[in-house]
Amino acid sequence: MQIFVKTLTGKTITLEVESSDTIDNVKSKIQDKEGIPPDQQRLIFAGKQLEDGRTLSDYNIQKESTLHLVLRLRGGGKKRKKKVYTTPKKIKHKHRKHKLAVLTYYKVDNEGNVERLRRECPAPTCGAGIFMANMKDRQYCGKCHLTLKAN
């Protein structure tokens, strides 16, 4: 029977084979016509790669079927070693949320009067509710970066 082999270049080769022929036998016939060694050939039929020891009838290849010839790729990339670090990773700073943190800015005395413990930023860009941080010799606004020296 006659089968067709389509190469990568689009060229179609006709081969005269029997259904009892092995895939090895077909590859050697392709080598005779094209000069490609059998170990570099991969034959594909109906989306499946054909194994060397099997016959054409195992894959239900009939007369005038078309096989696709693909060349085998060489090797693959080396597997990289995992990097071993000498120092441990730096632990990221975790933002701790304090419940009712606003209460640290005010003090309520026995008579119910509310006293502000921290100073509000006087800059017009900050607005109400922006408090200045107390340092040992100054007060600092974290929003507008205003610094006031303490006397």
Swiss-Prot record:
User: What top-level branch of life does the organism fall under?
Assistant: Eukaryota
Please give the SMART domains that the UniProt record associates with this protein. Ribosomal_S27 (SM01402), UBQ (SM00213)
User: For this UniProt entry, what's an example GO CC term?
Assistant: ribonucleoprotein complex
The residues that the entry says bind Zn(2+) are: C121, C126, C141, C144
A Pfam family recorded for this sequence: Ribosomal_S27
Record cross-link Glycyl lysine isopeptide (Gly-Lys) (interchain with K-? in acceptor proteins), residues: G76
Q: Which CDD domains match?
A: Ubl_ubiquitin
* Xref: PROSITE patterns: UBIQUITIN_1, UBIQUITIN_2
Which InterPro entries does the UniProt record give? Ribosomal_eS31 (IPR002906), Ribosomal_eS31_euk-type_sf (IPR038582), Ribosomal_zn-bd (IPR011332), Ubiquitin-like_dom (IPR000626), Ubiquitin-like_domsf (IPR029071), Ubiquitin_CS (IPR019954), Ubiquitin_dom (IPR019956), Ubiquitin_ubiquitin-like (IPR050158)
Tell me its family: In the C-terminal section; belongs to the eukaryotic ribosomal protein eS31 family. In the N-terminal section; belongs to the ubiquitin family.
Name of the protein: Ubiquitin-ribosomal protein eS31 fusion protein
Native source organism of the sequence: Candida albicans (strain SC5314 / ATCC MYA-2876)
